[in-house]
UniProtKB/Swiss-Prot annotation:
Gene: coaX
Subcellular location: Cytoplasm
Cofactor(s) required for function per UniProt: NH4(+); K(+)
Pathway: Cofactor biosynthesis; coenzyme A biosynthesis; CoA from (R)-pantothenate: step 1/5
Residues that coordinate or bind ATP: D6, V7, G8, N9, T10, N11, T12, V13, T134
Protein name: Type III pantothenate kinase
One GO BP: coenzyme A biosynthetic process
Metal-binding among keywords: yes
Chief location bin: cytoplasm
């Protein structure tokens, strides 16, 4: 069995793959804690695995992507001590299913490399990959496949938290469509601003990318809020895959083990 871990600034998502299946047997999302020790992580993962009757020795491979560099040695130690394996860490110099047309490839986040890997294998052709995470990232991969670059915008939750934190009378809200552009209350007005504002951001950046690179790019969405946006405002994404990052980790493990 393969344990894959995607460490983001806000959340960590992990899952178990078995026998080369493209869909994880199990997966879970938890808050990223930057103060955890390797033993605390080991205990956490052991508890998760035992929920599904999986013992540590059944894990024969491990890979992780991380945008929190301070956690990298802790993850390495956790895999070594608790699973007796050397985990693969995603980086731009590993074997990738695409080439990189980027003057400073070392600046590309591990999460973006993983997402591009899934698109190169599972969604061949010209793709715009949008990941709605702590940051909202757009990555562009052409038909060769070649990583061309991307766009990084603020994340939705970060922006919502900033508005609440920096104002005295605006309450926190749940992100959802208010159903109309003009709100009848403060909460509805904030919801309208974030919902339609984010729709405009997504559609506007997609439009500019297609204007620059061509109209025949498919748009693939992933991340925690992708299903919410797709259900309330269909048509932005040609395909959505909330587990796209975990699948990318599986692909890169197969290529590099």
């Amino acid at each position: 069995m393969l344990l894959v871990v995607d460490v983001g600034n806000t959340n960590t998502v992990f899952g178990i793959f078995e026998n080369g299946n493209k869909i994880p047997l199990f997966h879970k999302r938890t808050v990223t804690r930057k103060d955890r020790t390797s033993d605390e992580l080991g205990l956490f993962f052991r508890g998760f695995l035992r929920e599904f009757k999986i013992e540590n020795e059944m894990i024969t491979g491990g890979i992780y992507s991380s945008v929190v560099p301070t956690l990298n040695p802790i993850l390495d130690r956790m895999f070594q001590d608790w699973f007796k394996i050397e985990a693969i860490r995603v980086h731009y110099q590993m074997k990738l299913p695409f080439s990189i047309s980027y003057p400073r490839p070392y600046e590309i986040g591990a999460d973006r490399l993983v997402n591009a890997a899934t698109c190169a294998i599972d969604f061949p052709g010209k793709s715009i990959i949008i990941d709605l995470g702590t940051a909202t990232t757009f990555c562009v991969v052409n038909e060769k496949p070649e990583y061309l670059g991307g766009v990084i915008a603020p994340g939705l939750k970060v922006s919502m938290d900033a508005l609440t934190r920096n104002t005295s009378q605006l309450p926190p809200i749940v992100f959802q469509s208010p159903g109309k552009i003009l709100g009848d209350s403060t909460i509805e007005s904030i919801q309208a601003g974030f919902f339609f504002g984010w729709i405009g951001l997504l559609e506007g950046i997609i439009r500019e990318i297609k204007k620059d690179k061509g109209q025949d790019y498919q748009v693939i969405g992933t991340g925690g809020l992708v299903t919410v946006i797709d259900a309330a405002h269909p048509g932005i994404f040609d395909k959505i895959d909330p587990l796209l990052t975990l699948r990318g980790l599986q692909i890169l493990h197969l290529m590099n083990s």
